[in-house]
Regions:
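Glycine- and aromatic-enriched membrane alpha-helices
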Residues: 1-186
């Protein structure tokens, strides 16, 4: 809940309007962030971790837009960004006795950073190899000329005309235009 509130509030402050997707992604980011250390932190600290997770979801989404990276549902900042934060938060805020590792705070943070690095290298490596192998079997990207023409045309031989009828536009603009009748059509 705190992640949803922080994401919604930050999103409103940045965009000057309420965005439901930011609330939902903030809620998810808060949950992702607290998952790793939920057993080892107090309720106020859990709220802080969720709050930062929600803010990361908004900031990460804005960063991806700025970089031109397409993430239609905000999965990268919600899972990657808030996940990294939550993993670090275990080292920063986790009760060392409950964690039971015998490490100092600094050592625990180091272990959490090492875990993030190992996971990143492993996931990137496996994903890269898998995608390269799949691309050899069947191309994962269509040729540029197919993108330019549109996949409906290049793959299906179909063209869609999305022109909005004038009476619909007029109604949307608030003017009163006579609507076509069946006798008006040829």
């Amino acid at each position: 809940a705190v992640g949803a509130l922080s994401a919604g509030s930050l999103g409103f402050a940045v965009q000057n309007h309420v965005n439901v997707t930011q609330f939902v992604n903030g809620c998810l980011a808060g949950l992702v962030a607290i998952t790793a250390g939920c057993f080892a932190v107090s309720t106020p600290v859990a709220c802080l971790i969720g709050l930062v997770g929600g803010m990361i979801s908004v900031g990460g989404d804005e960063l991806l837009k700025y970089l031109g990276i397409d993430d239609a549902v905000g999965a990268i900042p919600v899972h990657l960004g808030a996940g990294i934060w939550g993993t670090l938060a275990v080292g920063l805020y986790g009760n060392l006795e409950i964690l039971g590792t015998g490490l100092t705070r600094g050592e625990q943070i180091g272990v959490q950073l090492l875990g993030i690095l190992v996971c990143a290298v492993w996931v990137f490596g496996v994903a890269y190899i898998t995608v390269r192998l799949l691309d050899r079997i069947t191309p994962l990207r269509v040729p540029a000329e197919h993108e330019d023409a549109g996949l409906n045309l290049s793959e299906h031989g179909e063209v869609e005309d999305y022109e909005i009828p004038e009476h619909v536009l007029a109604e949307f603009r608030g003017t009163n235009v006579r609507q076509p009748h069946s006798t008006d059509r040829e």
